[in-house]
């Protein structure tokens, strides 16, 4: 049975980094991405835990929706063996479908105003 992966993947990103990426037309990732050699993304189902574990109490975050279809995404195990999307190159911003500001919601976790994507 062939595994199917979602067409949309997501990145939580500091607004200042995103501003720089918009000027350049490409996103190379945050510090952890550059350190690891790939851009960390999440699926819609993984987003709430990603926000809670890695972005707790961090204001000024954005949720970037990315069309994964044309990208060379590598799916690799991470938290609990769950498969996460990774991009081993810079992200051309033409693949970004939507950018949304997050607010510090319940328990100081950055959250979209209308809830997480399904």
Task: Describe the residue ranges of each PLM region.
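Conserved, structured core segments of small domains
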Residues: 2-118
């Amino acid at each position: 049975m062939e595994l199917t992966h979602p067409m949309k993947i997501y990145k939580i990103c500091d607004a200042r980094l995103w501003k720089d990426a918009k000027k350049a037309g490409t996103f190379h990732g945050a510090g952890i991405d550059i350190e690891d050699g790939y851009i960390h993304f999440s699926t819609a189902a993984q987003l709430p835990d990603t926000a809670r574990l890695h972005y707790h109490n961090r204001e000024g975050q954005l949720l970037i929706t990315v069309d994964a279809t044309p990208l060379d995404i590598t799916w690799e195990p991470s938290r609990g063996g769950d498969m996460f999307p990774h991009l081993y190159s810079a992200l051309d911003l033409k693949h970004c479908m939507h950018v949304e500001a997050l607010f510090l919601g319940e328990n100081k976790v950055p959250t979209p105003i209308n809830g997480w994507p399904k």
